[in-house]
């Protein structure tokens, strides 16, 4: 991958087990930023951080951010586009879960 990827996760229902598989895949392909917006975004950010840390023997650094109830998907995308240092200039992918 030329640039580390940036993802905005739109949560429609809060935590679902599929998130674990998604995060594992994103780690595998080198995603460096993950913004979360929608239902229970703060909790999902914590879950993602825990998944990146794992048991602590081989932690993966991924910059994460949760967006409050007053923020839109557009706000989350805008922030992701502005971030470049350490995460690259690549496009922002929006994923709904």
Please place each PLM-identified region on the residue numbering.
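ATP-dependent carboxylate-amine ligase
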Residues: 1-97
């Amino acid at each position: 991958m030329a640039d580390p990827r940036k993802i905005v996760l739109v949560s429609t229902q809060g935590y679902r087990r599929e998130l674990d598989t998604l995060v594992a895949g994103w780690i595998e392909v080198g995603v460096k930023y993950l913004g979360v917006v929608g239902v229970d975004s703060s909790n999902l950010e914590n879950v993602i951080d825990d998944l990146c840390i794992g048991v602590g023997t081989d932690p993966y650094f991924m910059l994460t951010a949760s967006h409050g109830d007053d923020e839109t998907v557009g706000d989350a995308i805008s922030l992701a586009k502005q971030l470049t240092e350490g995460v690259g200039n690549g496009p922002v992918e929006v994923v709904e879960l």
